[in-house]
């Protein structure tokens, strides 16, 4: 417990919260270029081949980003949009691709939760 005199001299410092997505630098999204597109395996107890990409952002950061949805058209030098949001079973993956913007196409034949995957509404006739 500090004395009154110590508080007068120093004061109390408020704890600053650390950002969970520092590469965005307080922006909602960031643009970047894919430097490598590959698959990786998740932590135990899960098993899959998760699609991820290493992305060089416009601010110079190089981050690993998850490509959500079934199938994608990304390759090296694709220009992509990154948002925050980690993938719990992939260590080091703290960002998501925004589907349906820039070079990233939306998920084909998606009927539900379309806005999350950049899918257009299906025609009424089909």
Swiss-Prot record:
Segment forming the signal sequence: none
Pfam families linked: Ribosom_S12_S23 (PF00164)
Alphabetized GO MF terms: rRNA binding; structural constituent of ribosome; tRNA binding
Record GO cellular component, one term: small ribosomal subunit
SUPFAM superfamilies documented for this protein: Nucleic acid-binding proteins
Record-annotated membrane-spanning stretches: none
InterPro entries: NA-bd_OB-fold, Ribosomal_uS12, Ribosomal_uS12_bac
Compositionally biased intervals (Basic residues): 113-126
Keyword field: Methylation, Ribonucleoprotein, Ribosomal protein, RNA-binding, rRNA-binding, tRNA-binding
Region ranges (Disordered): 1-27, 103-126
3-methylthioaspartic acid PTM sites in chain numbering: 89
Any single GO BP term: translation
Described purpose of this protein according to its UniProt entry: With S4 and S5 plays an important role in translational accuracy.
Family: Belongs to the universal ribosomal protein uS12 family.
Assembly mode: Part of the 30S ribosomal subunit. Contacts proteins S8 and S17. May interact with IF1 in the 30S initiation complex.
Classification via HAMAP family: Ribosomal_uS12_B
PANTHER family: 30S RIBOSOMAL PROTEIN S12 FAMILY MEMBER
Protein name: Small ribosomal subunit protein uS12
Species for this entry: Paraburkholderia phymatum (strain DSM 17167 / CIP 108236 / LMG 21445 / STM815)
């Amino acid at each position: 417990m500090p004395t009154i005199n110590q508080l007068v001299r120093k004061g109390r410092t408020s704890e600053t919260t650390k950002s969970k997505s520092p590469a965005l630098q307080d922006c909602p999204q960031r643009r970047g270029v894919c430097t490598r597109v590959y698959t990786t395996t998740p932590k135990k107890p899960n098993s899959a081949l998760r699609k991820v990409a290493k992305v060089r952002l416009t601010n110079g950061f190089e981050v690993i980003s998850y490509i959500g949805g079934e199938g994608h058209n990304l390759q090296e030098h694709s220009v992509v949009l990154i948002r925050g949001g980690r993938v719990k079973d992939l260590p080091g993956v703290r960002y998501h691709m925004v589907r349906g913007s820039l070079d990233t196409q939306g998920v084909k034949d998606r009927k539900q939760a379309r806005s999350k995957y950049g899918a257009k509404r299906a025609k009424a006739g089909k």
